[in-house]
Amino acid sequence: MEKLTILILVATVLLAIQVLGQGEGEKPPKEWVQQYAAKRLWALMKGPRQCTPKDAPCDDNNQCCSGLECKCFNMPDCQSGSTCRV
């Protein structure tokens, strides 16, 4: 599985270099290629993002699944916690 991940990463970087190299004869900046490769590798290593479903406890909007927000149970003091809601 690791070899497949590395192979996909290398293919992605090579494809990016080829596509950028064809535009007006310019070569891509080395830093851009390295930064793109690092971001892609990090995303592959992390796997799919896990999100908090509706009505589950949360601390921040970033935890909630798409279309949901982390909101208080009771608005005045928010002592009882928050859940992901529409």
Curated annotation (Swiss-Prot):
Keyword Lipid biosynthesis tagged: no
Protein name, per record: Conotoxin Ec15a
Source superkingdom: Eukaryota
Cleaved propeptide residues: 24-49
MF terms in GO: ion channel inhibitor activity; toxin activity
Lineage summary: Eukaryota, Metazoa, Spiralia, Lophotrochozoa, Mollusca
Gene Ontology CC annotations of this record: extracellular region
Signal sequence coordinates: 1-23
UniProt keyword Secreted present: yes
Keywords: Disulfide bond, Pyrrolidone carboxylic acid, Secreted, Signal, Toxin
Originating species: Conus emaciatus (False virgin cone)
